Amino acid sequence: MKERILILLLLATVCSMQAQNIHMALRPDDLLIDNFEGDTFGNWILEGNAFGNSPVSMERLSIWGDNRFEGNRMASSFVNGDAGTGVLKSPLFRIERRYVNFLIGGGVDYQREYVALWIDGKEVKRSTGYNRRVMEYESWDVAEYMGKNARIVLVDQSKEGWGFINADCFYQSDTKLEKEIFAKRMLVTHRYLNIPVKMGAVIEQMDIWIGDKMVRNMEVELGGDEPDYWVTLEVKDWIGQELRIEASKSPNVEQALNQCFCSETPKEENLFYKEPLRPKVHFTSRRGWLNDPNGLVWHEGEWHLFYQHNPYGCIWGNMTWGHAVSRDLAHWTELGDVLHPDSLGPIFSGSVVVDKKNTLGCQQNGDTVLVAVYTSAGGFGYHTRHLQHSQSIGYSLDKGRNWVTFSGNPVLPTLVRYNRDPKVTWHTPTGRWIMVLYLDKQEYAIFSSPNLMDWTETDRFKLEGADECPDFFEMSVTNEPTVRKWVFTGANSTYLVGSFDGYRFRTETKPVKMDSGTNYYAVQTYSNAPDDRRIQIAWMNGSNFPDMPFNQQMSFPRELTLHRVDKGYVLKSMPVNELALLYGRKYIWKSLVVEEKNCFTTKLNTPAFYLKTGFAVDSVDAQLSLIHI
C-alpha cells in the first residue's frame, strides 16, 4: 500500500471537504494551556522547519483538507509537507487539574511523530495520530503529577508519507475529554445494510457491533442532508441479529445513521454502471474507491481480480479486498468484498495462490484451496493505529467466494514499519513457497516456506527507481525457447531479469521501466495461468471521476513476453487478444486525403470504440478504422 503516493491522491481528493469547527466548550474551572489562536506561537520554543513560524490558519487548513479543528488556527508540522522536521515546546506550566485534554491528528509513529508531556524535564506521556487528517480527542490522566512543572512537546522527525503531527486546544480539566457516541440499533432482516454517503462531509468513525463484538468498522462521510449516493455492507450472515451502529454524536450523524436500512438488493442497484463518467471497458467497482490489483490468480476457468477497495467512499481508506471474476479477460462480474479490516489492521495488498499440494492443511473433500497472503496494515485505522504492518493469510474453499482468516495471523511479524505487499509463488525445484516483500526505500526481501505459515528470509536486494508492490515470476524466452529467466518488477513497472535458485535472486540486467507513462501503477501478474501465459494488470492511478459514486479504474489486461536482445533481456507488453471479444460493428474509411480546410468528420452512435489509423505522411494519405465496442 501506498503511503507516498496515496497521501498525494488523498490531498487532491479531500480538498473540497467541509471544515468542521469544534467548539471545545471549556468549563469555568478548566485551565486553557494554548489554543493557538494568535498570530504567533508566543513563548513556545521552535526548532527546525516543520511547524513554520506561526499556527496554521483556517484558510490553509481547508486547502489541506483538514476537516475538524477548534477555532481558527492550530499547530501543524505539515507546513513544509512530509519532509519538514522539527520540535515545538510549550512554556512551563503547573499541573492543577486531573486531565490534560487536546485534539490530535496526523501520522502514526510513536517514535518520530507525536505529542509528549514532560514533567520536571522527563517525558511521562506520549500520543500519536493514526494516519488521518481529522482531529480526534485525546486525554492524559495526570493526577499523580499534581503541582509539578510540566511542558508539552510536539515532535516531528519523520520525512516519510504521513510524516506530520497536528494538535490543537490544550487545556487542563477535572473532566476527561471523550467523544459522545450516538448508537442506532436495528434488526438485520435482509442481505444488505444500506448506508448514505455525503461527499465532502466530515469523515466519521463508524463501528458496527453485535453484542460485545465489533464486526465491522469504517470511516464514512456522514452528512445530514440528502445523500449523494448509497453504499452497502453485506450482512446476510447476521440476519435475525441486532446491530448496534455507533459514531460520534452530532445532528448530521444522527440523521445519517437513522437513514440506514436493510434490503434484499442494494439501494440504487438500478443505477450501477450507468453513470455518465463510467468507463465502458476498463474495470471499475460499483461503488467506492479502488487502487492496487491484488491476488491475481486463474482457477478452474476463472480469472480472479481482487483489488484494494474502499467500499464506503470515493477517497482512499477502509482498505478491503474487493473481488471480480472473468472467464475471458474482457467481461468482468463483480462479486463483492471478501477480506475486511480486522484486529490487525486494514487489508493492504497481497497475492493469492492455488495450494495444490494442500501445504496449509485446510483442504476439505478434495476441493482445491485458494490462499491469500496479504499485509495487515497496523498503523492505519482508528482501532489499529497503535500496531505496525505484518503479513497474514486467509483461505477459501469455494473458489474465492468466501474466506476464512487464519487464526495464527500474522504469519510474518513486522520487519520494518511499512513492510508490505507480499507476492507468493511456488518454486518447483525446491518444493517450497517463495515470498517477495517490500521493506523500505527500494529494498525488498525474499522468503521461503514449506507451508505458507513459517517463513525464512533468504535474500535482500534493491530495485533502483521503484518501490512497493513486488512481483516475481519465471518466464520462457520467446526467441530462446529452452531458456527460462526470472523477472522481478516493482510498482511502477520497473523490472530486473535474472536467475533464481530458490534462495537468492541474481540479476543479469539493469533496471528498465516497462511503461513510461504515469497512469500504470501497482503492476501484478496472474499466477497459475493456463498455457504458461503471463498476464498483467495495473491500477490506472492517473484517473479521477469527479462527483461520481466510484473512483479509479484498472488497466486492460496485458500479455507479457520475454525476449533476448543484444543488451540482454527485455519484456514486451501487449493488450490481450481477448479484448477483440468486445468489438462490434466495424467502420473503415480508406484513401482519405487530409487538407487544411478539408477535415474528415462523421457521426457514430457508440459510447466507445477502438481506433486504428495509418498515415502516409509524404502524400498526406490516410486510412481510418473505427470498431464499435
Locate predicted features.
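Surface loop/turn signatures of beta-propeller and other carbohydrate-active proteins
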Residues: M24-P28, K125-T128, R133, K176-E178, ...
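Short beta-strands within extracellular/lumenal beta-sheet-rich domains
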Residues: N72-Y99, E136-E138, L177-L187
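Hydrophobic core segments of beta-strands in well-ordered, beta-rich domains
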Residues: N101-L103, I152-L154, I195-P196, I245-E246, ...
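Conserved small/polar residues in nucleotide/adenosyl-binding loops
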Residues: Y374, I627-I629
